Amino acid sequence: MTTIIELPEVLANQIAAGEVIERPASVVKELVENAIDAKSSQITVEIEESGLKMIQITDNGEGMSHEDLPLSLRRHATSKIKSQSDLFRIRTLGFRGEALPSVASISKLTIKTATADAEHGSILVASGGKIEQLEAVSTPVGTKIKVENLFYNTPARLKYMKSLQAELAHVVDVVNRLSLAHPEIAFTLISDGKQLTQTSGAGDLRQALAGIYGLNTAKKMIDISSADLDFEVGGFVSLPELTRANRNYITILINGRYIKNFLLNRAILDGYGSKLMVGRFPIAVIDIQIDPYLADVNVHPTKQEIRISKERELMALISTAISESLREQDLIPDALENLARSSTRSFSKPEQTSLPLQPSQLYYDPQKNDFFTKETVVSEDSPQGFNHETLVDSGVKQVDNLQLAKTESEAAAPSVKYASRPDPMLSDGEHPGLDVHNKQKLSQMLDRLENEEQSVFPELDYFGQMHGTYLFAQGRDGLFIIDQHAAQERVKYEYYRDKIGEVDNSLQQLLVPYLFEFSGSDFINLQEKMSLLNEVGIYLEPYGNHTFILREHPIWMKEAEIESGVYEMCDMLLLTNEVSIKTYRAELAIMMSCKRSIKANHSLDDYSARQLLLQLAQCKNPYNCPHGRPVLINFSKADMEKMFRRIQENHTSLRELGKY
């Protein structure tokens, strides 16, 4: 009797589903790719409970015949390749014939479909991979696939699903990537009856970018274009001033397929050269057209990994295209835009604001116990408002022509203003930023800071500054050189550590609320983690699609820090999958102290420098910044005398060496 048997087809499909269908977003990806292959111009994705309860994909594509419909649930049955040679010239997104049978094997599946030349359509109902119903039905041309109770017969997979918000964020990300890959298709994503994403299908990639990432982002994207005998490279990349804290905003497309490729990511960063800050990444959509013979798609069932011939040549082409496009741009940021952002952040509501012009000198306010810059205030008329949703949903306006007439209802509405992200080029280069991914290093840093003991600081008499970076002071033990950035970073850290730890209900109302704009997936992820922001006194409320409004701020946060501070907190929160409020507060204090401190090459007047030393003396540990760097070094009087050879080393006698 043989011990090797051929597995039943349903069981084989469930095994295949383990690789192909990882989560609800995987189902959305596979079914939408099928709709794209069917030459659809409109695709609607509807989900309930993040896709675990229901996923429905409706398209207006070619549809399937009554005879082909049951064959579509057979494993490795496909209309996209017919011979071995076809495997090396694949132009469709699907070709393996695994997705639909895999989905059917772990859910209840209903398919309604019709072709243009058929007298009637067809309906198929399957449960657990077994066909229960197949009959004629009246239905529009195209296909509607409904997936219900996903993973109902694979409880182990269901057990390891993340929260509904996290799964929804993955679905939004998949639809966004496919929308960028195919701007000629009108995509709509509806979750629990609420529309989350809609693109016009006008074929304008910049307009698709505006619908997904927002108008502010789309306006700061520049197009790239280059080609050689094997590749055509196009798309959009962000200006160096517009970056993110991770690579999630980089989208690489090959022949309309979204892929993941480390080397091509590296080529994009190389195209920016030194224009990017360390640890910052651009927003990019790189569309690559390639001869199918040069790309092997048959690497993994998810088809997100591709082996590319002449990969080095493609990397060089991408880097050159980006660097040349950046070279043609005026990379000097507009001063008024950097300071006010009024022209790019107030397009749904009018705005009134004043623009501080920052000089190079810092001053100290003894009443507020903090540093400030003398400001020249420039008044500016409120710009015309324009409607974000109307622009994206209608598909008839271009991003470059954004102004619409201000209506009476808009004029009567309370003023709000879009917050601007911090410019990474203005961040300090004193030391690498806080690496929240390095859990071991982060834990060691937090333990060291938590166990600090009170230190005694010497009395110092300030007498000068060098290169706008180092302060000189003398004391009983000689000369002291103080790193002004590290010194104020320590002062700020202990301030924020105490204030954030004492967060209560003390909030200050904002005269003009701020709007904070995020991508769809980030917006959903932040909603899930909003309790952590609430714990530190930040209360963001949803305000339209992909936007939060901030109406009040904690009293420990200065109003000048709100825009950049809230964005920095949100970016850090998005980078950390799981974090305790204690750890989050500690990380937040370190980050804010670094961002808010005096930088190198910044002149201090004598009074401000002396006040900084007085504040430093009051710190629990005045000798190290939160990252562990020394705040000050000391040359004793004896050290100075040795350096100037005022003290001669005694000659060591032979008797002292023990020879006699």
UniProtKB/Swiss-Prot annotation:
Transmembrane residue ranges: none
Which superkingdom?
A: Bacteria
* A cellular component annotation (GO) from this entry: mismatch repair complex
The Swiss-Prot or TrEMBL record annotates one GO molecular function as: ATP binding
Q: Which GO terms describe its biological process?
A: mismatch repair
Q: Can you tell me which family this protein belongs to?
A: Belongs to the DNA mismatch repair MutL/HexB family.
Question: Which PANTHER family did the record assign?
Answer: DNA MISMATCH REPAIR PROTEIN MLH, PMS, MUTL, DNA MISMATCH REPAIR PROTEIN MLH1
Question: Can you say what this protein is called?
Answer: DNA mismatch repair protein MutL
Q: Which organism is it from?
A: Streptococcus equi subsp. equi (strain 4047)
Gene name for this UniProt entry:
mutL
